């Protein structure tokens, strides 16, 4: 919608800051560890295939990818990580899903609850907002580098569900099972991806005003700064004036 930016575009802008914080490698490695608990062969483990594809998108070195797989399968120590999701609400009644990877469930739930409360949000019961989201692969590319025909041809032929123009950014949605194949096809076509990850896509979004948007971004930043938090998903559209402040 004109004047507002979707969550994936917000995440893309924030990703430039996240990269500076050096947390992307840790997130990618933890996701591989968790995924590899379901089996160390990506050919028969769709989640591991997707995790490896996302790790490659942030340039995680191959040796770190291999070590993370071995930690997940138990071949190396360090795989004692639990995957937990929390659901709740932020300012303006915005729905939030917080995905964490932790070795201490009690510590993490206490910290997430404290952050939500401090920033005008609240923890909800399991399932309170999860039904509002669908897990998808999301790949973004710079809209100025590639034409619609180039992106559509490479992505849709590889099995992507949808290609969208989100204000100067091409946003590609895939089923989880097709995510790795689409990422590989774009790479083979010589396309440079700004981001490639599994995300929770809201079925509907809520527009917020600038003041609420800033409060929400402070909440999201605080959650993402927590070492145990992997991802934060939300269903709000951010006014462009607030999005510009993320640059």
UniProtKB/Swiss-Prot annotation:
The keyword DNA damage does not apply. GO terms for biological process: regulation of DNA-templated transcription. It is found in: Cytoplasm. Keywords: Cytoplasm, DNA-binding, Transcription, Transcription regulation. InterPro entries: Integrase-like_N, TACO1_YebC-like_2nd/3rd_dom, TACO1_YebC_N, Transcrip_reg_TACO1-like, Transcrip_reg_TACO1-like_dom3, YebC-like. SUPFAM superfamilies: YebC-like. GO terms for cellular component: cytosol. The keyword Oxidoreductase does not apply. GO terms for molecular function: DNA binding. Residues 1-21 are annotated as: Disordered. NCBIfam families: PRK00110.1 (NF001030), PRK12378.1 (NF009044), YebC/PmpR family DNA-binding transcriptional regulator (TIGR01033). Belongs to the TACO1 family. This is Probable transcriptional regulatory protein DvMF_3201.
């Amino acid at each position: 919608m004109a004047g507002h930016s979707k969550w994936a575009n917000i995440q893309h802008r924030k990703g430039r800051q996240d990269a500076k914080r050096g947390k992307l490698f840790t997130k990618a490695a933890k996701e591989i560890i968790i995924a590899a608990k379901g089996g160390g062969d990506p050919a028969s483990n769709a989640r591991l295939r997707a995790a490896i594809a996302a790790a490659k998108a942030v340039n995680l070195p191959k040796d770190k990818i291999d070590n993370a797989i071995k930690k997940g399968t138990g071949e190396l120590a360090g795989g004692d990580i639990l995957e937990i999701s929390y659901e709740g609400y932020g300012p303006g009644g915005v729905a939030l899903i917080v995905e964490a990877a932790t070795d201490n469930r009690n510590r993490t739930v206490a910290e997430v609850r404290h952050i939500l409360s401090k920033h005008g949000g609240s923890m909800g019961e399991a399932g309170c907002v999860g039904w509002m989201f669908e897990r998808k692969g999301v790949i973004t590319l710079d809209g100025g580098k590639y034409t619609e025909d180039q992106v559509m041809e490479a992505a849709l032929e590889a099995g992507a569900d949808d290609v969208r123009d989100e204000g100067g950014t091409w946003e590609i949605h895939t089923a989880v099972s097709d995510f790795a194949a689409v990422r590989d096809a774009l790479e083979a076509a010589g396309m440079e991806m700004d981001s490639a990850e599994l995300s929770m896509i809201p079925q509907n979004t809520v527009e917020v005003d600038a003041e609420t948007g800033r409060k929400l971004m402070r909440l999201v930043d605080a959650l993402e700064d927590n070492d145990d938090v992997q991802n934060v998903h939300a269903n709000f559209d951010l006014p462009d004036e607030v999005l510009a402040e993320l640059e």
